[in-house]
Design a protein with these regions (language model features):
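Catalytic NTP-binding/metal-coordinating core of nucleotidyl cyclase/transferase enzymes
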Residues: 1-75, 79
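C-terminal tail/extension regions appended to the core domain(s) of diverse proteins
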Residues: 163-217, 224-227
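Glycine-rich portal/gate segments that line the openings of hydrophobic small-molecule binding cavities
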Residues: 240-241, 250-298, 311, 338, ...
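Beta-strand/loop substructures that line and gate deep hydrophobic ligand-binding cavities in soluble
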Residues: 289-345, 353-356
């Protein structure tokens, strides 16, 4: 029986410096630490991506077309790199072990390769394998000129991936680079400096709302992992499923949701304006809202994984110029409580990104 071709995004997350690390570290410790790092990376990529297989010091994942929009896929790539760097930092600062495996772990880094194309699934030795020219091309990037030149701390996207994900490379400061491979030819790619984004993220102060300043302070345990919860919380196509009949118009720099994205949410004749002012995928987001009849409001959402669930905490605070009276505050609280209850209900009954 012939296989049915599919199209989607192909991702390879590769640990840089793994061979040197393994050869210089204790064999009883190094594979465990490297495995922990790969598990951290895959945990942030999956969902929206699915793990195809682990390939030594790399993880190969994919997402079929229609599984998640381009912004959510970019969120996953960035979140994986940030989670990897945070895990390295915790190993470096929190361990008292003096073995080489722990001491040398901070020398590891990560590079991510993203391509979009066609593939088929084949059953080999009892396992599903992805195959096709585009799968080969994605793997060729691992040994390309950019990987050899830059070393680590970057994401390399083929032109096909950029087009499929709707990325505006100039607005995301992505450098152009051409690869050339035998039997494939020239491949135009774009490089994202993940290390620079991590540095900027580490230096940026997170927006927060103190409990005593909050006019809304709600927390709920939802039956989904942080990636699914984040998607339903932020995606214009998923928000109406729990926020009600709203029409959302979004404008994003670089075709990616993040700091600077503005949104107009229209319910009936009323429109709420939103601007994202803090964006840490799967962990934290903050918005500045212009709410009809009330004025400027600051809002934050914090997500924390708890087994297979997520603790979602939502806070709103009146910003300077707001005119919220006691009745307004009580109405807002009731609306947010009801919305979060609907979100939990939707997430409890849906087929999540991990199972689609």
């Amino acid at each position: 029986m012939s296989a049915t071709p599919e199209t989607g995004t192909l991702v390879l997350a590769d640990l840089t410096g793994y061979t040197a690390y393994l050869s210089q570290s204790e064999i009883e410790h190094a594979p465990t630490i490297a495995g922990d790092l790969l598990e951290t990376i895959v945990g942030r990529l999956e969902p929206p991506f699915r793990l195809a297989k682990l390939e030594g010091d790399a993880a190969f994942l994919y997402a079929e077309d229609g599984r998640a929009d381009g912004s959510l896929q970019l969120d996953a790539v960035e979140a994986a790199y940030f989670a990897f760097r945070r895990r390295l930092r915790s190993i470096d600062t929190a361990t008292s072990c003096d073995c080489n495996a722990c001491a040398l772990a901070p020398r590891l880094d990560l590079k991510v390769f993203v391509h979009h194309g066609a593939f088929v699934r084949s059953r080999i030795a009892g396992r599903d394998e992805l195959a096709g020219p585009d799968v080969i091309l994605a793997h060729r990037l691992l040994k390309g000129a950019i990987a050899a030149k830059r070393g680590s701390g970057f994401g390399q996207f083929t032109a096909a991936a950029v087009t499929a994900l709707g990325i505006r490379t100039d607005e995301l400061d992505m450098a152009t680079a051409r690869e050339s491979f035998d039997h494939v030819g020239d491949v135009d790619t774009f490089v994202m400096d993940l290390d620079a984004r991590w540095t900027a993220e580490s230096d940026r102060r997170q927006m927060s709302i103190a409990p005593e300043a909050a006019i809304v302070d709600e927390s709920i345990l939802v039956p989904a992992d942080p990636a699914d919860c984040w998607a339903y919380l932020t995606s214009p196509s998923l928000r109406p499923l729990w926020e009600g009949p709203i029409v959302i118009t979004e404008t994003s720099p670089g075709a990616r949701r993040g700091v600077g994205t503005t949104t107009q949410c229209v319910t009936g004749r009323l429109a709420t304006l939103e601007e994202i002012v803090d964006w840490q995928p799967y962990d934290h987001a903050a918005w500045r809202l212009a709410v009809p009849g009330i004025g400027p409001v600051d809002a934050t959402a914090d997500l924390e994984g708890a087994d297979d669930n997520t603790r979602l905490s939502l806070r709103w605070a009146a910003a300077p110029g707001a005119i919220a009276g006691p009745d307004d505050v009580e109405r807002i609280r009731a609306e947010r409580r009801a919305a979060l209850d609907r979100l939990a209900s939707v997430l409890g009954s849906r087929v999540g990104l991990a199972e689609v």
